[in-house]
Amino acid sequence: MHFTKETSPLISVIVPAYNVEQYLDKCLESIVGQTYTNLEIILVNDGSTDETKRLCEAWKDKDERIQVVHQCNQGLSAARNTGIDISKGKYLCFIDSDDMVDSRFIEHLVEALRITGVLLSATSYTEILEGKYPATPQETKDRTLQIREMSFEEAMTSALNGGCVGFYAWGKLFDASLKSVLRFPEGKKFEDQAIMYKVFEQAGKIAYEDANDYYYLIRSGSLSHSQHSVNIEDSYYAFSAMENHFSPDECSFYTQITARKLAACADTYCSYMLQGDKSGRQKYLMLLKAGSKEARANKHLRPALKLVYALASTSPILLDRLLKLYVNLSSRT
């Protein structure tokens, strides 16, 4: 399908950028090369200390659709919120500045919305290892796009189980009417988990398309590889808030939320224990003990995590030894 500025609604593409001088060009090349051209591309430079600021300004001079905002470093959530505040598009899209997208990425998401008439469309992603990704993303023009309308419950179940629709903000196209719930918590990690369930709920239905044409870069030092306890603790708080938001009698996925909360609690305990943080370890040991009965009864919690909860109540010293042994063995593989 061919899109023109006259027949297609404006889409705001929000790109937060912090110290991404080695990735930003590839990201923006993939965005300005979209087949869907009626875009406002909002670059939010979040206090970068490398060449990111200069690159943002250079790209603004290259393409009139690009606008740049420079702000002091406040984190990913604040940068996204800044982009949301100044956006004028009928739809919003988030792309991380170290990732890339296929040339038809936005076209596919728009098509899913047009066919289904819903407020939110989504696709999955393809992982790219740093230093091994192609110069240009693989084109998807030769395949037939499969579009499926998912209920709120189906989308939540998918996200909670690592399915095709996740809690991440990128890889999606949001109707601007969802802005009221599309506010990221500032100063927190796992910010997408903290709000996306509310966005799903507000949207009611989600149009999923299977192009998988968001290219997610796995790089050393990224949050996905970090074991810092405060990051994992934010995940625990996010799933706790999600659990409190819903009633166990009114949704089919409640025990799956609980399983994710219990897993995040165990991960946080392990992180504090390995760091030698006695206060943090004690705090989460008490939470493990308090949740042992809940963990034992939860059918969605992995057996290994059930064992963590059981040992926390009966033999925390043995638990710590086993966790350290597991980490040491894992680091050798």
For each feature predicted by the language model, list its residue ranges:
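Catalytic core of nucleotide-sugar-dependent glycosyltransferases
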Residues: 212-219, 226-253, 267-295
